[in-house]
Swiss-Prot record:
Function of the protein: This protein is involved in the repair of mismatches in DNA. It is required for dam-dependent methyl-directed DNA mismatch repair. May act as a 'molecular matchmaker', a protein that promotes the formation of a stable complex between two or more DNA-binding proteins in an ATP-dependent manner without itself being part of a final effector complex.
GO cellular component: mismatch repair complex
The protein's name in its UniProt record: DNA mismatch repair protein MutL
Pfam families named among the record's database cross-references: DNA_mis_repair (PF01119), HATPase_c_3 (PF13589), MutL_C (PF08676)
Originating organism: Anaeromyxobacter sp. (strain K)
Origin superkingdom: Bacteria
Keyword terms of this UniProt record: DNA damage, DNA repair
Molecular functions per Gene Ontology: ATP binding; ATP hydrolysis activity; ATP-dependent DNA damage sensor activity; mismatched DNA binding
GO biological process, one term: mismatch repair
Family in the record: Belongs to the DNA mismatch repair MutL/HexB family.
Gene: mutL
Amino acid sequence: MPRIHVLPPGLVNQIAAGEVVERPASIVKELVENALDAGATSVGVDVEEGGLALVRVADDGSGMDRDDALLALERHATSKLRDAEGLAAIGTMGFRGEAVPAIASVSRFRLDTSAGEDGAGTRVEIEGGVLGEVAPVARPRGTTVEVRDLFFNTPARRKFMRAASTEAGHVSEAVIRLALARPDVGFTLRSGGRLVLGARAGGGLADRAGQALGREAHRHLLPVDARRGEVRVHGLICSPDHSEATGRALYLFVNGRYVRDRAAAHAVLRAFAGTLPPGRHPAGVLFVELPLHRVDVNVHPQKLEVRFAEGREVFDALFHTVAGALRTAPWLRARPQPGDGVPVGDGGGPAPVPVAGEEAAEVLAWARAARPPEGSGATLVQPAPGAWATGRLAFPVVPAPGAGPEAGPRPEGYFAGLRYVGQHARTYLLCEAPGGTLVVIDQHASHERMLFHRLREAFRARRIPVQPFLLPQVVTLPPAAARALEAGLAELGRLGFDAEPFGGEAFAVKGAPAALAGVDLTALLTDLGSQLAEVERGSAVDDAFHDLLATMACHAAVRANQDVSPEEARALLDGLDAIDFKARCPHGRPVVFELSLADLERRVGRR
């Protein structure tokens, strides 16, 4: 039986390097973080062959004297941590004291550093973990680290490296993350002598975000800043007009440290629910700040993951901050302002909470409903004869007593300020905005968004008005949808349906949400049955009900190639101003398109 023995220090460092030094980008991250912890105001990074031949990081930080320079190359030697209490509240980027010796053990390593203003410094050279020359060197205050021939003494690790261009891309991404975290610090990155990134100190987060996300994304950035309890979320997020195919363009930082956290990213994605097309992801740069003792950063070899004491609190803060920004953003809505009947949060925008049951019932009175909840104060709107069969619009004009359809004040919002011109192709509403801008509104997408909003608010308040049928309507569904619907009758009831099995694949529907007057119940319940199969317990339930409500709104909304009267168009425009989000339908398609008078005149040669 083999005897247990203690590994030699060089091998220990190489094993540690396997965790800390995954690729050249890992070296860049560790060395730049050390520079930032040293108070650097300027950091320069140079790489050759993607960092495999050379990584050089130079900074103007505090530097080190000779003794500290040598001690920094010992394992678990650090200036950033002294006791267990400090480990529970880490505020620096590094703290373990293992990265530098691990890097030096798998490369030809040189450290030049100076802590004084007299130009006297120290040079330390190490090859494969073996200490070489230690000599004085003339240099200004700060530190320069050169790492050459990475993994020269561990060929098994070297062969797993990607092409130089791929590794250079990872280095660039690492520097971008660090530059986003510290807009107050200047950064340069050169690869093969070519300047890849130049970010001046103090340029602001918007400039850094533009460099990271691209010029097109920069045009769509919205500021976010809110606090919930002890958690503050701030930064920049792209409006739904710009999205990405993957989630890589969403940069999340916790107490200044870039992290990968699926729950946090999902919170942001949830905030965008119903605003992005399927398969698209939001982009932005978000910072989460909370007390140091409430987050554990010592859970990942490269400190890319963290553990929160109260993860739900962070999730809620991210969700409500981003969702609130989308509701209050200027591009999204000009009104209503505080006092217009919309719940107002601390920041002056709509509060990110469900509306009360009375308010939900009141807005749902737009639908051709028969019975709003008692005490709601909602206007009773009886369904027109044959409404369930004709499929007419579910937003009838309800004028004040004795007034015509144009009487009475309208919401003082963007859509209320439009002059309705007419309908194009029986699908688009054409309007004129002040200043001559042509506004084209997709009648189905806009009506779908309005119905979805009202269904969602009523669902949150558990007050969806139900239209009971005089006689049950029997619908027959495909076998798979019928099985899912029968298993999900409880969820169906929460959505406002009163249905029960009627033998085989048939169901007797005794009532349905009043907002869905005129829909094809068979088609709707078939779609809902398919989606109900995806409803699970836990966090997935809210996502699933979002999709169910979106399907209900889609079926109830006016269709393309359907006539809309001027009164109905006006009612739709006024209704859009009363909801918190109207730029996209629940499935992420745009609702509105604008063409300025200047653009129009350029297109016809008048300018």
